[in-house]
Amino acid sequence: MNIGKFKYIKKPSWFGDEGPIYEHEGLNEVLRVLFDQNTNDVKQMSVWETSFPPGVGIPLHKHPYPVEELLYVLRGQGMETVGDEQREVGPGSAVFIPPEVEHRIVNTGDEMLVLLVVVSPPGIVEKDLFQKKVKKATQVWEKDYF
């Protein structure tokens, strides 16, 4: 009896604890994807947790496409720059980054800075982009990738 070929269909997870974890070696950043198009079939946003050791952060950048970004500090202390504003952030701080506005964050404390990040529309956490960043983290930032 011929029943045809089987095709693997990944069932999306409704829980955010099954996503991939990426480490940007050149930045010492660890990023854990919680929800995105590839992990959970989330269509309107990407959500991840990212952490930086003391003295480390994301350089000043802006995204080359319209995207809204929300940051929520879970642990640690940092300095966030959005446009021409700069502010110290800590647990419970929430930051909105409008589309096409330069921004950066640096861990200014003595423990890990841990953030919950929400991006809409999704796309910045797409698998191929992060694989590129992971493989070439140092070169990516030197070339002002964002």
List where the protein language model places each region.
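Short beta-strand His + acidic residue motifs that chelate non-heme Fe in jelly-roll/DSBH
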Residues: L60, E80-T81, I97, H103-D110, ...
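A generic "binding-loop/recognition-motif" signal
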Residues: P66, E85, V101-E102, E111, ...
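Short, conserved beta-strand element in jelly-roll/cupin
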Residues: E49-P53, H63-V82, V118-S120
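A short hydrophobic beta-strand segment most commonly corresponding to one strand
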Residues: S46-T50, F96, E111-E126
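Short acidic-glycine-tyrosine-enriched beta hairpin
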Residues: D84-P99
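A short, N-terminal "cap"/entry segment at the start of jelly-roll beta-barrel domains
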Residues: M1-Q44, F130-F146
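Conserved short histidine dyad/triad with adjacent acidic residue
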Residues: L31-D36, W48-P64
